[in-house]
Amino acid sequence: MTNPRAQAQETKVALSRRIRDGLKRFFGPWGMFVRGFIKHPVMVGSIVPSSPTLIRHMLRPVDWKNTKLFVEYGPGVGTFCRPVLERMAGDATLIAIDTNEDFIDYLRKDIRDSRFIAVHGSAADVEEIIRAHGFEKADYVLSGLPFSTLPAGVGPAIAAATHRVLRPGGAFLVYQFRARARDFLATHFNRIDNAFEWVNVPPCFLFWGWKD
């Protein structure tokens, strides 16, 4: 005898899969990004991916020649991943961490680069994650996670873990739509450079927290 509840669940899963596949075919990366925003609004900072101008501005201070490990929190559909990979040396590694399994699945299929690792997990566990891939320290960590809307305690935990995982001289690169995000960095980073990027939707604050 067919279980009505199980059948309903199977129908729901199948429908969700068809919607996801349809979005991917019709809208490509942007459709996946919108779907991720709708599914996890507190974990995705904006419904619109970052602009090329913002990406260049954010990555400008990075010393690519001396970068062996670059970590990104909340990569979404890879808006930053591709420019980072273009700039990285051939022996460097990019680890992208996201709690949204749809984004991770998309990135694993879409980015074919041996230097790229997509991990389904929490940014607060960054130390364990990079150790699992043979690293002790990161040179740079990039984040567009919306610190001000994350669940209580998550933002401070991520900032603390990031400071611990960075090598001396490394930096935490943060782009946010609210200036309050600086407060999360100030607890751990003595030197914080900042800027504002107008050419983005919406315009946003940029912070670079440097580890002594």
Regions found by a protein language model. Give the residues of each.
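Conserved beta-strand signature within the Rossmann-like core of class I S-adenosyl-L-methionine
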Residues: 169-176
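Class I SAM-dependent methyltransferase Rossmann-like catalytic core
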Residues: 26-28, 32-65
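S-adenosyl-L-methionine
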Residues: 104-132
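A short glycine-rich, Lys/Arg-flanked "PGG" loop and its adjoining helix->strand segment in the class I
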Residues: 156-168
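Core SAM-dependent methyltransferase catalytic element
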Residues: 197-212
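Conserved class I S-adenosyl-L-methionine
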Residues: 67-76
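Conserved SAM-binding loop of SAM-dependent methyltransferases across substrates and taxa
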Residues: 77-90
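Conserved SAM-binding motif I beta-strand of class I
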Residues: 93-98
